[in-house]
Amino acid sequence: MVHWSAEEKQLITSVWSKVNVEECGAEALARLLIVYPWTQRFFASFGNLSSPTAIMGNPRVRAHGKKVLSSFGEAVKNLDNIKNTYAKLSELHCDKLHVDPENFRLLGDILIIVLASHFARDFTPACQFAWQKLVNVVAHALARKYH
Protein backbone atom coordinates (compact mmCIF):
# COMPACT_ATOMS: atom_id res chain seq x y z
CA MET A 1 0.00 0.00 0.00
CA VAL A 2 1.19 3.49 -0.84
CA HIS A 3 1.65 5.96 1.98
CA TRP A 4 0.39 9.49 1.35
CA SER A 5 1.45 12.32 3.61
CA ALA A 6 -1.15 14.87 4.65
CA GLU A 7 0.68 17.44 2.51
CA GLU A 8 0.61 15.20 -0.58
CA LYS A 9 -3.11 14.57 -0.16
CA GLN A 10 -3.75 18.29 0.26
CA LEU A 11 -1.68 19.22 -2.81
CA ILE A 12 -3.45 16.63 -4.96
CA THR A 13 -6.97 17.50 -3.84
CA SER A 14 -6.31 21.24 -4.03
CA VAL A 15 -5.31 21.08 -7.69
CA TRP A 16 -8.00 18.51 -8.50
CA SER A 17 -10.70 20.81 -7.13
CA LYS A 18 -9.79 23.32 -9.85
CA VAL A 19 -9.62 20.87 -12.77
CA ASN A 20 -12.14 21.22 -15.58
CA VAL A 21 -12.40 17.49 -16.33
CA GLU A 22 -13.84 17.98 -19.81
CA GLU A 23 -11.22 20.51 -20.91
CA CYS A 24 -8.16 18.93 -19.28
CA GLY A 25 -9.22 15.40 -20.18
CA ALA A 26 -9.68 16.30 -23.83
CA GLU A 27 -6.32 18.07 -23.91
CA ALA A 28 -4.50 15.20 -22.19
CA LEU A 29 -5.84 12.52 -24.53
CA ALA A 30 -5.28 14.71 -27.60
CA ARG A 31 -1.69 15.37 -26.54
CA LEU A 32 -1.13 11.64 -26.02
CA LEU A 33 -2.39 10.88 -29.54
CA ILE A 34 -0.31 13.69 -31.07
CA VAL A 35 2.96 13.24 -29.16
CA TYR A 36 2.84 9.43 -29.25
CA PRO A 37 1.07 8.71 -32.57
CA TRP A 38 1.36 4.92 -32.21
CA THR A 39 -1.27 5.16 -29.46
CA GLN A 40 -3.80 6.10 -32.16
CA ARG A 41 -4.17 2.43 -33.08
CA PHE A 42 -6.33 1.94 -29.97
CA PHE A 43 -8.69 4.65 -31.21
CA ALA A 44 -9.21 3.65 -34.85
CA SER A 45 -12.99 3.93 -34.41
CA PHE A 46 -12.69 7.61 -33.47
CA GLY A 47 -12.58 8.81 -37.07
CA ASN A 48 -10.21 11.52 -38.28
CA LEU A 49 -6.94 11.51 -36.34
CA SER A 50 -4.84 12.61 -39.32
CA SER A 51 -3.37 15.80 -37.85
CA PRO A 52 -3.01 17.65 -34.56
CA THR A 53 -5.86 19.97 -35.59
CA ALA A 54 -8.11 17.02 -36.43
CA ILE A 55 -7.29 15.30 -33.14
CA MET A 56 -7.83 18.44 -31.05
CA GLY A 57 -11.20 19.02 -32.72
CA ASN A 58 -12.38 15.41 -32.69
CA PRO A 59 -15.52 15.10 -30.53
CA ARG A 60 -14.84 11.44 -29.73
CA VAL A 61 -11.35 12.30 -28.48
CA ARG A 62 -12.88 15.03 -26.31
CA ALA A 63 -15.56 12.70 -24.93
CA HIS A 64 -13.14 9.88 -24.19
CA GLY A 65 -10.63 12.30 -22.64
CA LYS A 66 -13.36 13.45 -20.27
CA LYS A 67 -14.17 9.82 -19.44
CA VAL A 68 -10.50 9.02 -18.77
CA LEU A 69 -9.97 12.02 -16.53
CA SER A 70 -13.25 11.39 -14.71
CA SER A 71 -11.93 7.92 -13.95
CA PHE A 72 -8.72 9.50 -12.71
CA GLY A 73 -10.85 11.47 -10.28
CA GLU A 74 -11.73 8.15 -8.65
CA ALA A 75 -8.06 7.77 -7.73
CA VAL A 76 -8.11 11.20 -6.10
CA LYS A 77 -11.18 10.18 -4.07
CA ASN A 78 -9.69 6.79 -3.16
CA LEU A 79 -6.01 7.52 -2.57
CA ASP A 80 -5.73 4.72 -0.04
CA ASN A 81 -7.36 2.09 -2.28
CA ILE A 82 -6.20 2.83 -5.83
CA LYS A 83 -5.37 -0.80 -6.64
CA ASN A 84 -8.94 -1.96 -6.05
CA THR A 85 -10.39 1.19 -7.61
CA TYR A 86 -8.78 0.24 -10.94
CA ALA A 87 -9.13 -3.56 -10.79
CA LYS A 88 -11.92 -3.76 -13.39
CA LEU A 89 -10.30 -1.18 -15.69
CA SER A 90 -7.02 -3.09 -15.51
CA GLU A 91 -8.82 -6.26 -16.55
CA LEU A 92 -10.59 -4.47 -19.42
CA HIS A 93 -7.41 -2.86 -20.76
CA CYS A 94 -5.43 -6.10 -20.48
CA ASP A 95 -7.85 -8.82 -21.52
CA LYS A 96 -10.16 -7.04 -23.95
CA LEU A 97 -8.41 -3.94 -25.29
CA HIS A 98 -4.81 -5.26 -25.14
CA VAL A 99 -3.38 -1.83 -24.37
CA ASP A 100 0.37 -1.73 -23.81
CA PRO A 101 0.71 -0.81 -20.11
CA GLU A 102 3.51 1.63 -20.99
CA ASN A 103 0.76 3.85 -22.41
CA PHE A 104 -0.62 4.37 -18.90
CA ARG A 105 2.70 5.89 -17.85
CA LEU A 106 2.80 8.05 -20.96
CA LEU A 107 -0.70 9.36 -20.29
CA GLY A 108 0.27 10.09 -16.69
CA ASP A 109 3.26 12.11 -17.84
CA ILE A 110 1.05 14.00 -20.29
CA LEU A 111 -1.43 14.72 -17.50
CA ILE A 112 1.38 16.26 -15.43
CA ILE A 113 2.18 18.60 -18.34
CA VAL A 114 -1.48 19.56 -18.77
CA LEU A 115 -1.94 20.27 -15.06
CA ALA A 116 1.30 22.26 -14.88
CA SER A 117 0.26 24.38 -17.86
CA HIS A 118 -3.22 25.05 -16.48
CA PHE A 119 -2.23 25.60 -12.85
CA ALA A 120 1.32 26.96 -13.10
CA ARG A 121 1.12 29.01 -9.90
CA ASP A 122 -0.17 26.07 -7.83
CA PHE A 123 2.02 23.44 -9.47
CA THR A 124 5.07 23.81 -7.25
CA PRO A 125 7.82 21.18 -7.19
CA ALA A 126 6.17 19.62 -4.11
CA CYS A 127 2.85 19.52 -5.94
CA GLN A 128 4.49 17.99 -8.99
CA PHE A 129 6.08 15.34 -6.76
CA ALA A 130 2.69 14.43 -5.29
CA TRP A 131 1.01 14.29 -8.70
CA GLN A 132 3.87 12.29 -10.23
CA LYS A 133 3.55 9.82 -7.38
CA LEU A 134 -0.20 9.60 -8.03
CA VAL A 135 0.06 9.04 -11.79
CA ASN A 136 2.72 6.37 -11.17
CA VAL A 137 0.46 4.58 -8.67
CA VAL A 138 -2.49 4.77 -11.10
CA ALA A 139 -0.36 3.48 -14.00
CA HIS A 140 0.84 0.60 -11.83
CA ALA A 141 -2.73 -0.22 -10.74
CA LEU A 142 -3.92 -0.22 -14.36
CA ALA A 143 -1.02 -2.48 -15.36
CA ARG A 144 -1.64 -4.86 -12.44
CA LYS A 145 -3.65 -7.41 -14.45
CA TYR A 146 -0.72 -7.74 -16.88
CA HIS A 147 1.54 -9.21 -14.18
Swiss-Prot record:
The text of the family note is: Belongs to the globin family.
Q: What keyword terms does UniProt attach to this protein?
A: Heme, Iron, Metal-binding, Oxygen transport, Transport
The subunit field of the Swiss-Prot or TrEMBL record says: Heterotetramer of two epsilon chains and two alpha chains. Hemoglobin E (Hbe) contains a alpha-A chains while hemoglobin M (Hbm) contains alpha-D chains.
Any Pfam family hit: Globin
Q: Which SUPFAM superfamilies match?
A: Globin-like (SSF46458)
Residues making up the signal peptide according to the UniProt record: none
- Tell me what this protein is called: Hemoglobin subunit epsilon
